[in-house]
């Protein structure tokens, strides 16, 4: 599904402000543009462009939807410590665009290298937003979702589906979470490392990186912020699934993130 220019053009304008080329003239420049823009998704620098929010000047005001400056360095340090060095570099340079109270799904450096350099600019923008869940959640809470549960993303109308919730193989859209709770030191944001780029469109499916990591076992997860995702849907499309009792034999607890 393609989005209209209403949300596309404002984000392109912001990318220009950060010296990201958006009108390449050669094949080499197009390849550089695609990879440069795609790494933005790994640190959640997508703003809520569909509502026309302007970038805030005061970074310490958490009401403007931007990550406070005091949380940027812990975010960067967490990413470097887990090997997501591309994400860390972009977070450091584009810190005024990182949204708060969200969950970032960050592909590995190897996954970035495998991205098709010929993606259209609109596909790139949509892909950026598709890697940001609209609520912060720890891996422990995320892993309690039923298979088939749909999680809302910043790409309007597009969901990410839980495709496996077994203890040693938790996947979203068949993509493994290999590094849960990467950003455990931040107050407002959660992020989890994945081994492939998530494709909102089946024609954009990419392969895992050349040295993809195995799935991470759920029992190793560490604490991180969690909240009930307002738009999460269960397999039968029941709203607010945290109010349901789970029938799972694996656990008697709710299989959905618990509200704070």
UniProtKB/Swiss-Prot annotation:
Query: One Pfam match, by short name?
Result: Fasciclin
Cellular component GO terms held in the UniProt record: plasma membrane
Instruction: Indicate which residues are glycosylated according to the record.
Output: 118, 169, 176, 201, 236, 247
Q: Annotated region Disordered: where?
A: 210-260
Q: Where in the cell is it found?
A: Membrane
All ranges on the Extracellular side of the membrane:
59-260
Cross-referenced InterPro entries: FAS1_dom_sf, FAS1_domain, FAS1_domain_protein
What is the membrane topology here? Answer: Single-pass membrane protein
What are the annotated disulfide bridges? none
Q: What is this protein called?
A: FAS1 domain-containing protein SELMODRAFT_448915
